Amino acid sequence: MSWFNRVKPSISSTAKRDVPEGLWWKCEECGAALHKKQMEASDHTCPQCGYHFRISPYKYFSLLFDNQKYVEFDDHLRAADPLHFVDTKKYPDRVSDTIEKSGKTEACRNAHGLCGGETLVISAMDFSFIGGSMGSVVGEKISRAVDKAIELQSPLLVISQSGGARMMEGAFSLMQMAKTAAKLSLLSEHRLPYISLMTDPTMGGITASFAMLGDINISEPKALIGFAGPRVIRDTIKRDLPEGFQRAEFLLEHGFIDRIIPRRELKSDLTTLLSLMKL
């Protein structure tokens, strides 16, 4: 009965390779699988459908500043907890956890350098840090970016990428809307241009304050731009919304923004704008 006890050889299988995390991306628009090198070559846009992935302030700095050289400033500012706010966790703990996980210190970064040979100050927001929400630090950083632009006698570019005001700071957060709007008026007094670039998403108190106050308001393709979200509006008015409502293309058609610029054309178009504004 030796044949009965004979063990059949198992099917051989190839050992699985460990794929490094972040090597492959999936396009949220068309589902295409994109290699990291493809993403970097296309400035984190989908080569198939043109979808724009969210990128960090550092990537915008590298994209826009000549030779990727720039000077960051006011990185030492940190959020306080004046309301001792607690939801599922204490606000300071939430900020600390976000800093630890992301390696970022706030939802906004400031830098200055040369863009097309012209001095430019950039204040860029980061959705990955608590939804890019605007608290007292973000408001202060944008205000200081205005001061730096006046000091250098240069234009200011603010790149918005935010869900709105930071609820954990309550009225202190809402105060930043008035603060940033008032501060931007100083640029007009000094005859310095302010360019607002809205990326996906630009919502809530950001749209209601500095994002729509640019001398020139531009946007990346298909960016969600508005105050309340489409679902909230639909549920409130009990009506279906037009197709593409609150997308950049809809806003351009209705005169709310001046131009839509694909990310790969942003540096060249911005250089042209800066040279024209200098005349």
Swiss-Prot record:
HAMAP family referenced in this protein's UniProt entry, alphabetically: AcetylCoA_CT_beta
EC number: 2.1.3.15
One Pfam family from the record: Carboxyl_trans
InterPro entries the UniProt entry points to: AcCoA_carboxyl_beta, Acetyl_CoA_COase_Trfase_b_su, ClpP/crotonase-like_dom_sf, COA_CT_N, Znf-ACC
Principal location listed in the UniProt entry: cytoplasm
Subcellular location, record wording: Cytoplasm
Protein's name in the database: Acetyl-coenzyme A carboxylase carboxyl transferase subunit beta
Biological processes, Gene Ontology terms: fatty acid biosynthetic process; malonyl-CoA biosynthetic process
Known role: Component of the acetyl coenzyme A carboxylase (ACC) complex. Biotin carboxylase (BC) catalyzes the carboxylation of biotin on its carrier protein (BCCP) and then the CO(2) group is transferred by the transcarboxylase to acetyl-CoA to form malonyl-CoA.
Cofactor: Zn(2+)
Residue ranges constituting the CoA carboxyltransferase N-terminal domain according to the UniProt record: 23-279
Catalysed reactions, semicolon-separated: N(6)-carboxybiotinyl-L-lysyl-[protein] + acetyl-CoA = N(6)-biotinyl-L-lysyl-[protein] + malonyl-CoA
Subunit description: Acetyl-CoA carboxylase is a heterohexamer composed of biotin carboxyl carrier protein (AccB), biotin carboxylase (AccC) and two subunits each of ACCase subunit alpha (AccA) and ACCase subunit beta (AccD).
Residues that coordinate or bind Zn(2+): 27, 30, 46, 49
GO terms for cellular component: acetyl-CoA carboxylase complex
